[in-house]
């Protein structure tokens, strides 16, 4: 979903609020702040990507770095095991985001511009990059 701001910048507030609501049910209380921050940052950066092939990059990197660190801190704190836990969690979050954002995201970025009712909401500069 965080690739949507590439086509629809107005989707950013809805994605951020939706992330916050979902994070209310997270076992990690810090997810309310950091998970939502990762989504906001990913959406804002995705809006600025020059083409659809780079659009999945911000969500993958933001979540990998921010959420990976959050989970590592939650599991082991900032003690000696933090960096090992961070490497593992950043990798696993990154792989999950890569699958979701690249594969499913590209499907969305291909299909949505073809829906006639949605085309008026896509900026012209984006339609040229599809």
Whereabouts are the PLM-identified features?
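Generic transmembrane alpha-helix motif of multi-pass integral membrane proteins
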Residues: 1-11, 42-46
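Residue-level recognition of membrane-helix boundary sites in multi-pass small-molecule transporters
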Residues: 10-14, 54
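Membrane-embedded alpha-helical hairpins and interfacial helices in multi-pass inner-membrane proteins
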Residues: 21-38, 44-130
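Membrane-interfacial helix-loop connectors
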Residues: 6-9, 17-27
């Amino acid at each position: 979903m965080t690739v949507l701001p590439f086509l629809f910048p107005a989707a950013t507030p809805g994605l951020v609020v939706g992330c916050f609501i979902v994070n209310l049910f997270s076992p990690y209380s810090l997810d309310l702040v950091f998970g939502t921050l990762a989504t906001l940052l990913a959406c804002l950066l995705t809006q600025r990507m020059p083409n659809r092939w780079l659009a999945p990059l911000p969500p993958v990197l933001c979540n990998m770095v921010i959420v990976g660190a959050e989970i590592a801190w939650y599991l082991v704190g900032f003690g000696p095991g933090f960096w090992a836990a961070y490497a593992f969690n950043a990798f696993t979050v990154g792989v999950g985001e890569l699958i979701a954002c690249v594969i499913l995201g590209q499907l969305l970025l291909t299909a949505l511009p073809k829906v006639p009712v949605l085309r008026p909401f896509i900026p012209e500069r984006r339609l040229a990059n599809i």
